A protein has these predicted regions:
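Conserved donor-binding loop and adjoining core beta-sheet/short helix segment
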Residues: 25-79, 187-201
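Acyl-donor-binding surface of acyltransferase catalytic domains
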Residues: 65-130, 263-269
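Short amphipathic alpha-helix that is part of the acyltransferase structural core
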Residues: 1-28, 123-157
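A structural microfeature
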Residues: 49-51, 108, 184-187, 215, ...
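Conserved GNAT acetyl-CoA-binding A-motif
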Residues: 79-91, 226-241
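A conserved beta-strand-loop-helix scaffold within acyl/acetyltransferase catalytic domains
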Residues: 54-57, 160-180, 185-204
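Conserved acetyl-CoA-binding loop-helix of GNAT-fold acetyltransferases
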Residues: 68-80, 205, 211-227, 250-254
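Short glycine/proline-centered loop/turn elements that form peptide/ligand docking sites
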Residues: 219, 245-248, 267
């Protein structure tokens, strides 16, 4: 594995290995320049297959160009790596079988759900027992992000580094759930704006508060605070949820979110 030194080198590799019919999950083309400038992009090339690695705060993400499913790669000294495959419909068994032979194991499946405001159920969790508000203090953002990072897989769970906390505070991107008198932190929600779409990045609830409607209260607050007063009925929302998390899936479905036939499966090593 070697560092990619410039964008021309990256382009040359993509052109060489990005042949017609190849299997690829290379989603980094638009950010390749930035990754190279940060010395965060590496590559491991073989006769017919190539693998890019992006250094993250914890571990690495791998992106591949696979032209030959019989050509083995030497990943013996590579650890703490996640590879994520986007798919619609059937699970991409060819890539999964190849990657498992190279030492990866299946981690989890995430499904994308979406809705417009007009499709969503009215709030049913407004209760005096749970108070939801925007995080106004750095310490509140810090507490929320620690909960997110502790609740989700550190390789595939979108780890939030401390360097992002101030930006999250400045942009009002964190919602906090408290008990009635604000003496107990119950949970948090991280939201992202992608164009005209309001996206849930993370939702997590403290263990002692689970099963008490905290997650529903956070989602309801997220929906209401982001509705567009001029086009309220058409305000758009999206989220990703682990397919294995049946309680969360049911909560979103009951709210009115629909699966849009877009999923990812992650494998880790």
């Amino acid at each position: 594995m070697k560092k990619v030194d410039n964008f021309s080198e990256y382009q040359a590799i993509v052109e060489k290995y990005g042949q017609k019919g190849c299997l690829s999950n290379d989603y980094i083309q638009q950010e390749a320049v930035d990754l190279i400038l940060r010395d965060a992009l590496y590559v491991d090339c073989y006769g017919k297959n190539a693998f890019f690695f992006v250094k993250k705060e914890i571990g690495m993400r791998m992106y591949y160009y696979i032209n030959d499913l019989t050509e083995n790669a030497d990943f013996c000294n590579i650890h703490d790596v996640v590879v994520e495959i986007l798919f619609r419909g059937e699970i991409p068994n060819a890539e999964i079988e190849y990657l498992t032979k190279q030492g990866f194991r299946i981690n989890l499946i995430r499904d994308q759900y979406a809705a417009m405001y007009k499709d969503l159920a009215e709030n049913s969790t407004l209760t005096s027992e749970v108070k939801v508000e925007e995080a106004k203090l750095y310490t509140a953002v810090e507490t929320a992000c620690k909960l997110f990072n502790d609740s989700f897989d550190k390789l595939s769970g979108d780890f939030i580094p401390a360097s992002e906390y101030q930006k999250l505070l400045d942009t009002g991107s964190i919602l906090i759930a408290w008990n009635a008198d604000k003496t107990s932190f119950l949970g948090a929600l991280h939201q992202v704006k992608e164009g005209a779409v309001n996206v849930i990045g993370h939702v997590a609830v403290m263990k002692h508060a689970r099963g008490k409607g905290v997650g529903k209260a956070l989602v309801d607050a997220f929906v209401e605070r982001n509705k567009n007063p001029e086009k309220m009925e058409k305000t758009r929302y999206q989220l990703w949820v682990q397919r294995q998390n049946e309680a969360a899936v049911k909560m979103y479905q009951n709210k009115g979110f629909k699966y849009i036939n877009k999923s990812t499966i992650s494998l880790i090593k």
